[in-house]
Amino acid sequence: MNVKVENIEKNVVKLEITVDSEKFNEAVKKSFKKNAKRFNVPGFRKGKAPLNIIKKYYGEGVLFEDAINFCCEDTYPKAIEENNIKPVDYPQIDVVQIGEGKDFIYTAEVTTVPKVKLGEYKGVEVKKVSYEVEDEAVENELKSMQEKNARVSLKEEGEIEKGNIAIIDFKGYVDGKAFEGGEAKDYEIEIGSGTFIGDFEDQLVGLKKDESKEVNVSFPEEYGREDLNGKPATFEVTIKDIKVKELPALDDEFAKEVSEFDTLEELKSDIKDRMKKELSEKAKAEYEEAVVEAVGANAEIEIPKVMIEKEIENMVRDLEMRLKYQGLDLKSYYEFTNSSEEKVKEYMRETAEKRVKTDLIMQEIAKVEDIKATEEELKEKAMEVAKQYGQKDVEKTAELIANAQKAYLEIDIVNGKVLDLLVESSKEIA
């Protein structure tokens, strides 16, 4: 095998690979063995005609397609490895020379991993990130707990007031016609919750059980449905029942009922501690992101479009999987969000480019700093992932993961080590 490499443009190379005639003839014979049964030649049982007869009857090129595939599968990986070429996509294969008794020559044009020119990555200055737990946030959490533990009972007499829960039947009309999704029966709505559009809920205040009313509202301009965006609507509403919500008193007894604590002050203290931890983790994540962005701003890199497109495809697949867990599919998602595949992909583009750039920079730093994943770290990471699957035999699952996903585990471990290096060497400024 002989290989010539030509740089035809930035991050794109063309390899001219020559396979000697003897090797190509072996590939033709292999192709014959694979396809012999499909050839039907007069005077021979189907699949029993010898190679030379097949060539005469069908022409020498009849076996070339598979022979080409066999040769490329064997020689292309060797060619890129020997020339230290790291492709990011499948190659474009073109045949230059092919024929009986001739060397087989083909070209493989491929986009390669771009070169990364690192700037300053140690000691980058990043603004300090910190959050304080506000008393209001603690009070809001207590109110939320209070709401969840409220006692709800029927309001036998009287009108709807703010804070009441109304059980309603409704049917909506736009331009005088009923619209899809605009009708429901025995629907519960808390007055003042802002669940419905406009002042729909406010217009129910003062109504009694079994009373009906026409409610007039307008849909927001960006409601998410082209047939409803910005349009006025009329709803026929009937009050089926009214419920009143009684909130429990915020006292020590409440704390005992909803938690492991004996006093309200202990419960408040616990809520504050949990919020501090959450905000500390949030600040840490934001600081790490800022460090990576600062390092990225110092680096020079021209990312091939194909890498961004591949990352977008990965993001779409991830979205599809998340939707599947919710019992949805992409088509339903596009309809619900008034979007399309093209719009979603375009929305993802900036994030995809950022991810690819970050990965390339992290890999380059790992190379410069000689950061690698050890076998012990791989085992630990595989075990960590295996535990998330909830299988009985965690060790066996971890072993399978370590073998099947080794490359992904290595990247995850190495990127984590690089991030630690960048953060530890960074300078926090006010």
UniProtKB/Swiss-Prot annotation:
One of its GO terms (biological process) is protein transport. PROSITE patterns: FKBP_PPIASE. InterPro entries: PPIase_dom_sf (IPR046357), PPIase_FKBP_dom (IPR001179), Trig_fac (IPR005215), Trigger_fac_C (IPR008880), Trigger_fac_C_sf (IPR037041), Trigger_fac_ribosome-bd_bac (IPR008881), Trigger_fac_ribosome-bd_sf (IPR036611), Trigger_fact/SurA_dom_sf (IPR027304). Keywords: Cell cycle, Cell division, Chaperone, Cytoplasm, Isomerase, Rotamase. Residues 163-248 form the PPIase FKBP-type domain. It catalyses: [protein]-peptidylproline (omega=180) = [protein]-peptidylproline (omega=0). It is found in: Cytoplasm. It is an enzyme of class 5 (isomerase). SUPFAM superfamilies: FKBP-like, Triger factor/SurA peptide-binding domain-like, Trigger factor ribosome-binding domain. Pfam families: FKBP_C, Trigger_C, Trigger_N. Its EC number is 5.2.1.8. One of its GO terms (molecular function) is protein folding chaperone. Its main location: cytoplasm. GO terms for cellular component: cytoplasm. It comes from the Bacteria. Consists of 3 domains; the N-terminus binds the ribosome, the middle domain has PPIase activity, while the C-terminus has intrinsic chaperone activity on its own. PANTHER family: TRIGGER FACTOR CHAPERONE AND PEPTIDYL-PROLYL CIS/TRANS ISOMERASE (PTHR30560), TRIGGER FACTOR-LIKE PROTEIN TIG, CHLOROPLASTIC (PTHR30560:SF3). HAMAP family: Trigger_factor_Tig (MF_00303). Belongs to the FKBP-type PPIase family. Tig subfamily. Involved in protein export. Acts as a chaperone by maintaining the newly synthesized protein in an open conformation. Functions as a peptidyl-prolyl cis-trans isomerase. This is Trigger factor. It comes from Clostridium botulinum (strain Kyoto / Type A2). The gene is tig.
